[in-house]
């Protein structure tokens, strides 16, 4: 579909040597805009959905003053943050202080380039797409470290140390989870990983959701979800910005849009972790059952529903569990999740070589 649009645009332009030079660059810019505008809208309205859902769970009203049912609240928040003064501490490293938020949000946005929204709907259909996502998202920790160091504050630096240790620790468990999915799917291409979940005995009998990876890889799925919460520094793993100890962690010296960019990166990472869970474990754009009454629903709607359910799980966890101590978080990552995922890796390898291989 993306290639067809590119060729159609090429034919509409007048001929000439410059067309072959200008259109590819213009096409790249159009794809970037087509990705960023909906993503920024989704990130903005995720903040509203979180506040509304938390209000429902805590038996109170969420934001309901700006616009009908509070639907314009994210726009009001954005305008408020845009008009706030950006203050830099006098002892801060000015260049690095500005670079920190940029380094935090760039990987969270760049990884979306290889995310497929349908069998032929992806900005870049890369064969090693899952590996590329892992590589890009691992850079995000540098933004946190730079922000903590450049602020020249003990609270910011301590928060950055906590964040970097936590993110690196849970990246290992998440990496093993993704490796298991790659093994059973036989590919690192995200489109092929989704299509591989449409095969099997259950899918052949029209019960597609039983052939998705969430069922045979249930322990791996649970580890991935919990590691995703920790990786994005969300509650109850948000000791990075523990208000009672270090105020706001590595963001303590930031104000205005500098502060907002860190939150945009956090919510963009939530969407990314959620859509990866939908693609790798929940069948992506595949419908749950093979029914004629469901064929009219586009695949991207199924993918959106599954992604929203996973995102809502993030919010439900925030409303339910108390914050963990830092030593408990490290113990969970190193002493429980990594051994469990290593054991699952060995079991999955033996399962693939056995006569009971269900992924043939």
UniProtKB/Swiss-Prot annotation:
Keywords: Cell inner membrane, Cell membrane, Membrane, NAD, Quinone, Translocase, Transmembrane, Transmembrane helix, Ubiquinone. NDH-1 shuttles electrons from NADH, via FMN and iron-sulfur (Fe-S) centers, to quinones in the respiratory chain. The immediate electron acceptor for the enzyme in this species is believed to be ubiquinone. Couples the redox reaction to proton translocation (for every two electrons transferred, four hydrogen ions are translocated across the cytoplasmic membrane), and thus conserves the redox energy in a proton gradient. This subunit may bind ubiquinone. It is a multi-pass membrane protein. The chain crosses the membrane at residues 20-40, 95-115, 130-150, 176-196, 206-226, 261-281, 297-317, 336-356. This is NADH-quinone oxidoreductase subunit H. Its main location: membrane. One of its GO terms (biological process) is aerobic respiration.
């Amino acid at each position: 579909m993306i290639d067809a649009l590119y060729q159609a645009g090429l034919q509409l332009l007048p001929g000439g040597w410059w067309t072959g030079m200008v259109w590819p660059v213009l096409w790249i810019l159009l794809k970037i805009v087509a990705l960023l505008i909906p993503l920024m809208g989704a990130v903005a309205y995720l903040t509203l959905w979180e506040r509304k859902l938390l209000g429902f769970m805590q038996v109170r009203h969420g934001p309901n003053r700006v616009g009908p049912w509070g639907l314009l609240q994210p726009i009001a928040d954005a305008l408020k943050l845009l008009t706030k003064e950006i203050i830099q501490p006098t002892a801060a490293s000015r260049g690095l202080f500005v670079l920190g938020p940029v380094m935090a949000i760039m990987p969270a946005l760049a990884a979306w380039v290889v995310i497929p929204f349908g069998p032929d709907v992806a900005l870049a259909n890369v064969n090693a797409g899952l590996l590329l996502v892992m590589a890009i998202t691992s850079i995000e920790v540098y933004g946190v470290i730079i922000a903590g160091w450049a602020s020249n504050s003990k609270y910011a630096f301590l928060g950055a140390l906590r964040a970097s240790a936590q993110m690196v620790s849970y990246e290992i468990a998440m990496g093993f989870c993704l490796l298991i999915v790659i093994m059973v799917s036989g590919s690192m291409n995200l489109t092929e990983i989704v299509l591989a979940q449409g095969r099997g005995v259950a899918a052949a009998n029209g019960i597609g959701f039983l052939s998705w990876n969430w069922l045979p890889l249930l322990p791996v799925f649970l580890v991935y979800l919990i590691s995703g919460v920790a990786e994005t520094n969300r509650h109850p793993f948000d000791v990075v910005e523990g208000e009672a100890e270090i105020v706001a962690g590595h963001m303590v010296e930031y104000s205005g849009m500098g502060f907002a960019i860190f939150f945009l990166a956090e919510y963009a990472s939530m969407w990314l972790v959620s859509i990866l869970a939908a693609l790798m474990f929940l069948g992506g754009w595949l419908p749950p059952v093979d029914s004629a009454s469901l064929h009219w629903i586009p695949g991207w709607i199924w993918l959106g529903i599954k992604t929203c359910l996973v995102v809502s799980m993030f919010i439900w966890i925030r409303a339910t569990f108390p914050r963990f101590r830092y030593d408990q978080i490290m113990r969970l990552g190193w002493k429980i999740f990594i051994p469990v995922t290593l054991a699952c890796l060995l079991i999955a390898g033996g399962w693939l070589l056995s006569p009971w291989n269900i992924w043939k």
